[in-house]
Amino acid sequence: MTGRNKAHPFCLWMLSAALGVLSMAVRAEGMRLPLPSPGLMPNPAAGKVLYEQSCASCHGADLKGSDKGPPFLHRVYEPSHHANLAFQLAVKNGVRAHHWQFGDMKPVSGLTPDDVAHITAYVRAEQRRAGIR
């Protein structure tokens, strides 16, 4: 192999296996994945407004966290560790505390999958600005 990462095929296989397991778990639970509308172009500006209304009180107006919730401007939330679907699932189902000591996150009512896609686009844009890729 010339300059290619030999782990790449293994990583793709692991990702595929993980998605397969997730898919089976979702079917077993009778849940539907919260997905944005087909063709939606997530808008960071719209996401900023929604973030300020629904997320900033815990995750900080500056995305740097608060005494109630963790920062999104942190490597833990980079796309390779928390994919965009993780944001959708967190809003829909809540999250058990696993990286931080803030306690469990409850589901967030009143946000659609499209809203969450806009919020995620805003968070990702701010992460890129902060050098988190």
Where are the model-predicted features located?
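Hydrophobic transmembrane alpha-helix bundles
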Residues: 28-38, 42-43, 97-111
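Axial heme c-ligation environment in periplasmic c-type cytochrome domains
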Residues: 66-75, 93-126, 131-133
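Short low-complexity stretches enriched in small and charged residues
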Residues: 27-31, 44, 58, 76-77
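Gly/Gly-Pro-rich "capping" loops immediately C-terminal to redox-active cysteine motifs
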Residues: 37-38, 42-44, 48, 64-92, ...
